[in-house]
């Protein structure tokens, strides 16, 4: 099953889809010249089963981003559900971050407990990402990022992908809507003082969406909503793709 990703790429190409698997800085720079681009990522670093060699093998198969933990503890660090233990990166976890930096694999800190987050910030020599997180200042869910974490990612030259998980957008999940997506984006942009480090984070395959979103087809509505809030075309382009592609060019 390890090579399923590359099998799918080959199948798409056989079916006539102009798809680019992003493996290098040059691929990230060229992505907009193709109909579609993909990036192989793993959510939950426990997938490498305590082995740096497994991480290297996955890199050779195309892995270019990995979430260090899910919400529970693994041999890399504690997830947010383990926050009371105060656990940060383990000795092995520190080696994982260093090897990901060396190889050119994007370090994803969504799901990690605060202690581990700060360990990564202090250890990583490359920009990091929180692929699917929102602002704790608007919705105090443990999975969201507080102001200090948001500012740290800004200083790290990294990126936050705002997720559409309704429980992270609004404390009243039944009221979560596209306006909340806008509010979290706007909150982060104002806090950072720039529009270079925030983007769309989605999590379409792993959560329940707000009532006015159906899936990837809802991106048009999000963009139109941002336009209605007088966001410039330049800022919207950064949010939809440019910030992510720029980040990949710094890391891969």
What are these regions (language model features)?
Residues 50-60, 82-129, 142-156, 179-196:
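Histidine/acidic residue-rich metal-binding segments in metalloenzymes
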Residues 27-29, 47-48, 72-77, 112-118, ...:
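Active-site environment of divalent metal-dependent phosphoester hydrolases
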Residues 1-52, 68, 77-85, 89-94, ...:
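A metal-dependent hydrolase metal-coordination microenvironment
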């Amino acid at each position: 099953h390890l090579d399923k990703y590359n099998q799918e790429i080959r199948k798409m190409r056989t079916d006539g889809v102009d798809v680019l698997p992003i493996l290098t800085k040059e691929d990230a720079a060229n992505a907009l010249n193709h109909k579609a681009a993909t990036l192989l990522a793993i959510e939950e670093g426990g997938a490498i089963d305590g082995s740096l060699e497994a991480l290297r093998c996955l890199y050779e198969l195309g892995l270019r981003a990995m979430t260090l933990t899910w919400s529970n503890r693994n041999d890399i660090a504690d997830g947010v559900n383990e926050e009371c233990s105060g656990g940060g990166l383990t000795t092995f976890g520190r080696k994982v971050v260093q090897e990901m930096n060396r190889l050119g694999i994007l370090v994803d800190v969504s799901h990690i407990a605060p202690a581990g987050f700060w360990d990564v910030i202090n250890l990583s020599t490359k920009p990091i990402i929180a692929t699917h997180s929102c602002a704790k200042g608007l919705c105090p869910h443990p999975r969201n990022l507080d102001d200090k974490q948001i500012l740290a990612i800004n200083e790290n030259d990294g990126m936050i992908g705002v997720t559409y998980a309704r429980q992270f957008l609004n404390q009243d999940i039944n009221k979560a809507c596209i306006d909340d997506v806008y509010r979290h984006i706007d909150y982060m942009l104002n806090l950072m003082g720039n529009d270079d480090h925030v983007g769309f984070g989605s999590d379409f395959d792993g959560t329940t969406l707000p009532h006015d979103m159906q899936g990837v087809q809802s991106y048009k509505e999000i963009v139109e909503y941002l336009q209605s809030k007088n966001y410039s075309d330049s800022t919207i382009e950064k949010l939809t793709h440019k910030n992510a592609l720029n980040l990949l060019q710094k890391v891969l």
